[in-house]
């Protein structure tokens, strides 16, 4: 029974991924989320920029939490990844962190709450592909000698 549910969820997730592709981001990254806001009869897209402090859930229930400081107050918002309210996510900068959940940022203010920028902005898959290509070139060079 659960396999059927997982299969249906995977199909729905793939269908949504076709329409809009989200970047590969993780906690510590600064993201700009395009959110569809309905005010009365009008709908518009509003940008919500902040630090992703957590990702949780799996499948269609996956969500991420974004924290920003607005007029001196910390504001956190949880976005479901596959929600129609989320128009898109733009990766502003990658952060260098060693935790999956950055809830400790809630207690920090000012410079203490800053996250260092990651120097290598490539994703893990891109780094591994480059490493494999370098190893292949090295093997070809050794075979030629």
From Swiss-Prot:
Pfam family, one: Ribosomal_L19
This protein's record includes keyword Cytoplasm: no
GO biological process: translation
Keywords: Ribonucleoprotein, Ribosomal protein
Superkingdom, natural source: Bacteria
InterPro entries: Ribosomal_bL19, Ribosomal_bL19_CS, Ribosomal_bL19_sf, Translation_prot_SH3-like_sf
Function: This protein is located at the 30S-50S ribosomal subunit interface and may play a role in the structure and function of the aminoacyl-tRNA binding site.
PANTHER family xrefs: LARGE RIBOSOMAL SUBUNIT PROTEIN BL19M, RIBOSOMAL PROTEIN L19
Family of this protein: Belongs to the bacterial ribosomal protein bL19 family.
Name of the protein described by the UniProt record: Large ribosomal subunit protein bL19
Name of the coding gene: rplS
């Amino acid at each position: 029974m659960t396999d059927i549910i997982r299969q249906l969820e995977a199909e729905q997730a793939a269908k949504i991924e076709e329409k809009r592709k989200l970047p590969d981001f993780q906690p510590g990254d600064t993201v700009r989320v395009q959110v569809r806001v309905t005010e009365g009869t009008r709908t518009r897209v509003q940008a919500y920029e902040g630090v992703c402090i957590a990702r949780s859930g799996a499948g269609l229930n996956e969500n991420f939490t974004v924290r920003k400081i607005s007029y001196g107050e910390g504001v956190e918002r949880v976005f479901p990844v596959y929600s129609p309210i989320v128009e898109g996510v733009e990766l502003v900068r990658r952060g260098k962190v060693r935790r999956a959940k950055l809830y400790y940022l809630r207690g920090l203010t000012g410079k203490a709450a800053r996250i260092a920028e990651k120097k290598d902005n490539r994703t893990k898959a891109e780094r591994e592909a480059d490493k494999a290509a370098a190893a292949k070139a090295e093997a070809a060079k050794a075979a030629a000698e």
